[in-house]
UniProtKB/Swiss-Prot annotation:
It is found in: Cytoplasm. The keyword Magnesium does not apply. Transmembrane segments: none annotated. Residues 111-329 are annotated as: Domain III, AAA+ region. Coiled coil: none annotated. GO terms for biological process: DNA replication initiation; regulation of DNA replication. Its main location: cytoplasm. The lineage of its organism: Bacteria, Bacillati, Bacillota, Bacilli, Lactobacillales. The keyword ATP-binding applies. PANTHER family: CHROMOSOMAL REPLICATION INITIATOR PROTEIN DNAA. This is Chromosomal replication initiator protein DnaA.
């Protein structure tokens, strides 16, 4: 990369980071690369699924950086992974044929869903360790964490990660013997083979795998047909003894798998246990920003933030909300999804789903003020003494965490401040919490008073 190309690309990244939320930047921009700038055309390498986002949101960034560095209008030519020939062990491997090879494999054997990958999994603080462990397992199956046990509530991405592990291994080794199956289906297969007196076939099928991916293992903990846990125990031992990778997911920790034999619980804890929790606001915004690329509608930022505030339990609710909105927008022949349209579309889902308590921002300001010994008037004003600034930033942080208000709306409630001020306060307090345990306890105490 020439000096001018480096300056240009650094400026593109700088402008993008200043305009986007951190989680959005990390997902859509961080992994992109500038290959060259030739004849006023910037060739940029990125994931193909992110092209539409760049076209919609970063054109002005490219133009600005282009005029600053080259004093010219720079256009963009996007290059995708499947277009690049990657030399590996002196063999050129093209990603597109690899993907075709994956799709052409007998899916009845692995039952993997090819749409799930690490590349399209949105990372946040709530799932970072689970993702890192999953990637490590996919890179060196059977040697790193065996078994890998991922637990968390429904709709948080456990099934996505299971399939991503399998697909990643299969891309590197198309001959790998992989099986994705729910614990419920494992039980069903066991019952069928018992009835047909073909247990040898079941043993052959599962005990000679290279990678076993079991979803919702808690189903095995139910009181099932005698011998099911015994068979799974023997399958587990056969695979583990041969250094074959096992990955399990559950809605609870191994120790809370009631009615499961102790010897199985013990084995589930041999490797690594990681937790996935509900996505925070910033991750939900990134998830929505990614998902709306699948729809032919315009979603203004305030609409995205509104939706992110409405559903805080899992990703499936967010996906369902977008489907509801698509239905209403198509019926009304609307191109731009305003907050009002979104609210109308998701009304039934909100009534049927878990209710979010509506917390006035003024209540947050009041409780924060009482805790830190300042008035609401001081929180809204411009005075910058240390205790008032801390109270103000904590109140902004909680307003974003505990309400569905957009950043501009929150800023308005704090003396008409700009949305960037709110975002700065939110990021600052979030960073401080990760380093200051006493502040984290203070904020939890305030949250409990508000609730």
């Amino acid at each position: 990369m020439t000096e001018n190309e480096q300056i240009f690309w650094n400026r593109v990244l700088e402008l993008a980071q200043s305009q986007l939320k951190q989680a959005t930047y990390e997902f859509f921009v961080h992994d992109a690369r500038l290959l060259k700038v030739d004849k006023h055309i910037a060739t940029i390498y990125l994931d193909q699924m992110k092209e539409l986002f760049w076209e919609k949101n970063l054109k002005d960034v490219i133009l600005t950086a282009g005029f600053e560095v080259y004093n010219a209008q720079i256009s963009v030519d996007y290059v995708f992974e499947e277009d690049l020939m990657i030399e590996q062990n002196q063999t050129k491997i093209n990603q597109k044929p690899k993907q075709q090879a994956l799709n052409s494999l007998p899916t009845v054997t692995s039952d993997l869903n090819p749409k799930y990958s690490f590349e399209n999994f949105i990372q946040g603080d709530e799932n970072r360790w689970a993702v890192a462990a999953s990637i490590a397992v996919a890179n060196t199956p059977g040697t790193t964490y065996n078994p890998l046990f991922i637990w968390g509530g429904p709709g948080l991405g456990k099934t996505h990660l299971l399939n991503a592990i399998g697909n990643s291994v299969l891309l590197e080794n198309p001959n790998a013997r992989i099986k994705y199956i729910t614990a419920e289906n494992f039980i069903n297969e066991f019952v069928i083979h018992i009835r047909l007196d073909t247990m040898d076939e079941l043993k052959e099928k599962f005990r000679n795998l290279d990678l076993l991916l079991i979803d919702d293992i808690q189903s095995l903990a139910k009181k099932t047909l005698s011998g099911t846990q015994e068979e799974f125990f023997n399958t587990f031992n056969a695979l583990h003894n041969n250094n074959k990778q096992i990955v399990l997911t559950s809605d609870r920790t191994p120790d809370h798998l009631n009615d499961l034999e102790d010897r199985l619980v013990t084995r589930f804890k041999w490797g690594l246990t990681v937790n996935i929790t509900p996505p925070d606001f910033e991750t939900r915004v990134a998830i929505l920003t990614n998902k709306i690329q699948e729809y032919n509608f315009i979603f203004p930022q305030d609409t995205i933030e509104y939706l992110a505030g409405q559903f805080d339990s899992n990703v499936r609710d967010l996906e369902g909300a977008l489907k509801d909105i698509s239905l209403v927008a198509n019926f009304k022949q609307i191109d731009t999804i305003t907050v009002d349209i979104a609210a109308e579309a998701i009304r039934a889902r909100k009534q049927d789903g878990p209710k979010m308590t509506v917390i006035p921002i003024e209540e947050i300001q009041t409780q924060v003020g009482k805790f830190y010994g300042v008035t609401v008037k001081e929180i809204k004003a411009t005075k910058r003494t240390q205790n008032i600034v801390l109270a103000r930033q904590v109140a902004m942080f909680l307003a974003r965490e505990m309400t569905d208000n957009s950043l501009p709306k929150i800023g308005k409630e704090f003396g008409g401040r700009d949305h960037s001020t709110v975002l700065h306060a939110y990021n600052k307090i979030k960073n401080m919490i990760s380093q200051d345990e006493s502040l984290r306890i203070e904020i939890e105490t305030i949250k409990n008073k508000i609730k």
